[in-house]
Amino acid sequence: MAKKLLLGDEAIALGAIHAGLSGVYAYPGTPSTEITEFIQGNAIARERGLHSRWSTNEKTAMEAALGMSFMGKRALVCMKHVGLNVCADPFVNSGMTGVNGGVVVLVADDPSMHSSQDEQDSRFYGKFALIPTFEPSNQQEAYDMMEVAYAYSERIKLPVLMRVTTRMAHSRAVVEVKDEPSQENTLNYDAIAANWVLLPANARKRNDFVTAQQAQLEEDAVSSQYNKYVEGTDKKLGILASGIGYNYVMECFPTGSPYTILKVSQYPLPKQFVRRLMDECQEVLIVEEGQPFIEDMVRGVGDPKNVHGKLDGTLPRTGELNPDIVKKALGMESGECFDPCADVAPRPPALCQGCGHRDVYTALNEVLKEFNNPRVFGDIGCYTLGFLPPFRAIHSCVDMGASITMAKGAADAGQWPAVAIIGDSTFTHSGMTGLLDAINENADITVIISDNLTTGMTGGQDSAGTNKFEAICRGLGLSDEHLKVVVPLPKNMPEITQIIRDEINYHGTSVIIPRRECMQTLQRHLKQKKAAEKK
């Protein structure tokens, strides 16, 4: 066994490769992005020709993974928590179809919303879809679980959801890894068509089958190597800890816990262990990262007055946990903390100097001064920072692709002018259908597709629509007369402002594409070019 220092994301990626992975499908989103990037750069993955291209969105990623599974091979789907909303349709239905080759759906939740718009807990999706969920407590488990999850997926013929959180994904630890990776599955034709064609007659049978499996899945959770019941000597308190929450608990007891601890890293919740904990201990503390998912269920098993956690305020309901927070919940004193930020001047996030989005907002703000009550609907990406000073340019940002459809809805309500601003990667992710709606109804909106030739905010991944946006807009039915392309530079400001002014005054759907490469990827490409010239 070799030892490697790995991020949680890297441990997951390497675990998948060593488990005989044939393809990863993903849309970049913090904190899950590094999984796919690691696979793309891994020597074994390259040698084997593993599929590792970015997908257009999470839904297409999930469906492609199901196609690979249909042919008997092992697939990995990666996304951040809100991406699971996007692929909910195929994800939930994958519980009905089942799998042929193993499928692991890796979802990275973001408590404290470091780079997200909500704190949703993906474990609810696993329960809703009736599929098992794994939640590693450390990087070693994250690596080891991948092989276990694929074997389990193929044994029970269901996909497996694996849930991690930001701190697990982006912290490093030494991980023992296998010397030799497992071989990939061979192509096979064992998939039963009746399971995969979800006509009502077939789906009813599959629904009965999956529902009947739940008792076995719970038995498997009780016998899982990742769920442990460690009896303590002090029965005043029992602790149920899940995922990384277990690590935080153990940090509070470096020489061992006097209390009984139930560690949960595989779901459905092992109720047999929970009942034992409730029977043996006077009080129970639930330590879980995210929503009170387990706590809600445990309160239905015993006297809720004896259950403590997020619902009674023992632990904070929002934000990340950490060892100090858990110590406080246990009534223990935590050491004094050094505040590294006490003397540091605040530096809020801002668009990079030289960024093309800056020039777009400068021009847009200049033009919108000429109108009464303009509204600008923003989207997810670097350009969302246009909400902050000095631009203060956008009035909404809800979810991927919402800018165009919200602008259309506002125009339907009588708002004018209604402007949508969306990035290139977000447009192909989920903006095209909204533009089609607008074009079909000739909605009175102006759409700005701010194209920086990359998926910038998550690190400069390839953008699916690069060099295709004009063709896409024409294909959706937009006329060339109201499809404009500009280069966002200060020297072009008179031209850009006039085009924005003209298209706002046109009463119909128009699209403006300001196109200039992201400054970060431009600098990276220049460095690569210089390095290549020196060779």
Predicted regions and their residues:
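Short acidic, glycine/serine/threonine-rich loops at helix termini
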Residues: 35-38, 64-66, 87-91, 113-120, ...
